[in-house]
Regions:
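Active-site beta-strand/loop architecture of penicillin-binding DD-peptidases
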Residues: 1-9, 13-21, 38, 42-123
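A structural-propensity feature for long, helix-poor, extended segments
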Residues: 19-24, 28-29
Length: 123
C-alpha cells in the first residue's frame, strides 16, 4: 500500500497518505461479473501477455491519443494497462503507462506480468 509521496531530489516525504476503510460501492454480484470480464481481457483479449501468471490476473488495456506527432507524422500515444493480481483474491493493483509511445518493445500487460513475477519471487 502506498504510504507517502516522496520528493524526487531529497527522498523526503512530501505528503503522507491516509487509508480510509474500504466500503462496498457496487453490489457483490456486479463486482464478480466485472472481475470475470477483466479476467477474460487477460485470458482471451488484448492483455494476453499477462495470461501465464500464477493465480491468474485481470485487467484492462487502453490507448489515449496525445495529438503529438513525430516529424515523420506518427502519432505519439499513451498506452495503459491497469491490472490486479492474483485474480481470485487480489493483493496488488498495478498500472503501467507507456507515455508518448510510438512503438514499444513490450506491451503494458507484459510489463505488468514481469512486475507480478518479481513480486511473487520476492515472496
Amino acid at each position: 500500500m502506498l504510504q507517502a509521496t516522496l520528493d524526487e531530489a531529497t527522498g523526503q516525504p512530501v505528503e503522507t497518505l491516509s487509508h480510509p476503510r474500504g466500503r462496498r460501492v457496487i453490489p457483490a454480484q456486479s463486482a464478480a461479473l466485472l472481475r470475470a470480464m477483466l479476467e477474460q481481457v487477460v485470458q482471451q483479449g488484448t492483455a494476453q501477455d499477462a495470461a501465464g501468471l500464477s493465480g491468474g490476473a485481470g485487467g484492462k488495456t487502453g490507448t489515449a491519443q496525445t495529438g503529438q506527432f513525430t516529424p515523420e507524422g506518427a502519432e505519439r500515444c499513451n498506452l495503459w494497462f491497469a491490472g490486479f493480481w492474483p485474480a481470485e483474491k487480489p493483493r496488488y493493483t498495478i498500472v503501467v503507462l507507456q507515455d508518448g509511445a510510438i512503438h514499444t518493445a513490450y506491451s503494458g500487460a507484459a510489463i505488468f506480468a514481469q512486475v507480478c513475477n518479481a513480486l511473487e519471487a520476492a515472496g
